[in-house]
């Protein structure tokens, strides 16, 4: 859990504490469930880079060849924003033990 603290800190700092974010994170629930199902089939090794975030990650068709020789696992969904990612971070990351996590949201 200590490994997730820096990621969560960055995510929380990136979000304005004064702004009211809409509670629309549930709209990605089906996408997240599909990614959890994929996690049962494709695990991230200790030296992999886990890419999480919006559809830019999901639609990056050549991510494995573009990031070669690194092992990568892409977990992109919908049109994610930081407040969505905060909501789903544990579910997207908990089954992996990556060397690094790359985050991209619009």
Describe the function of each predicted region:
Residues 1-50, 61-68:
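N-terminal secretory targeting modules
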Residues 4-5, 51, 82-83, 104:
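Phenylalanine-focused residue identity feature
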Residues 14, 76-78, 100:
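Small-side-chain structural scaffolding
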Residues 22, 72-82:
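Acidic/histidine-rich helix-loop elements
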Residues 50-52, 73:
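Conserved beta-strand elements of the Class I
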Residues 57-71, 83-106:
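Oxyanion-hole/transition-state-stabilizing segment in secreted/luminal serine hydrolases
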């Amino acid at each position: 859990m200590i490994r997730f603290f820096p990621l969560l800190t960055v995510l929380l700092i990136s979000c304005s504490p004064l702004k009211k974010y809409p509670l629309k994170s549930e709209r990605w629930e089906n996408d997240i469930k599909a990614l959890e199902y994929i996690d049962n089939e494709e695990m991230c090794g200790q030296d992999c880079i886990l890419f999480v975030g919006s559809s830019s990650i999901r639609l990056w068709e050549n991510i494995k060849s573009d990031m070669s020789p690194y092992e990568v696992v892409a977990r992109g969904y919908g049109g994610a924003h930081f407040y969505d990612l905060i909501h789903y971070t544990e579910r997207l990351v908990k089954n992996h033990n990556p060397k690094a996590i790359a985050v991209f949201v619009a």
